[in-house]
Amino acid sequence: MGKLFVISAPSGTGKTSLIQAVLEDPVASNTYLGISYTTRKARPKEEDGVSYFFVSQMSFMEKVKNNDFLEYAEVFGNFYGTPKDWVLSVLSKKENVLLELDIQGALQVKKAFPEAKTVFIIPPSYEDLTKRLESRDQDSKTEIAKRLKEARNEVNIGKDFDQVIVNDDFDAALEDLKQFMFTSEGVTNERSEIIKNSLDLLLD
């Protein structure tokens, strides 16, 4: 069996960019990104079957009824689900699966697959996260406030994941992610100390 990795993070933390970068590295040649089903509308540049499988709520609920999802969750009014058969098929070929999920989904997968390795990515500070959300220019002030409140709740849960990574420096965070996923040594002691300090700051 291959390995199942689950990566979660508050919105605006740079999770998607880190995942794209790790998958482009030769070390991840046998690691595949899971594509979720979702009922939300596609954003600009998102493609059906590449970014997500975009479906109606009726179609999604039919899949829930048929037990087609490894996990599913409602996030900000939209549903997301991970196709079970695809994940099991890839793992059975001794290849790895990387799932990019919200924290609810990550917890569901860990419960169903205790051997899954969970990663939670944090910002260096809430001030930094606020700036990132504002610079995306895709959310209203009300939406940003909602996401920041949600981020605080998520950090309280994500602190107990198998590995926490702080995206204070993109290259360093990418190296931490690769170390955790593909080496037996894991994250270096120096970076572990930085991660611990950042987490303490967010939990204070």
Where are these regions (language model features)?
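NTP-dependent small-molecule kinase module
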Residues: 138-139, 156-204
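The conserved Walker
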Residues: 9-11
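ATP-dependent small-molecule kinase phosphotransfer cores
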Residues: 36-97, 104-107
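Pre-Walker A (Motif I) flank of P-loop NTPase domains
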Residues: 1-5
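Walker A/P-loop
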Residues: 16
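Post-Walker A helix-loop "phosphate-sensing" segment adjacent to the P-loop in P-loop NTPases
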Residues: 24-33
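Conserved phosphate-donor/acceptor-positioning beta-strand/loop module used by diverse small-molecule
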Residues: 97-102, 111-135, 166-169
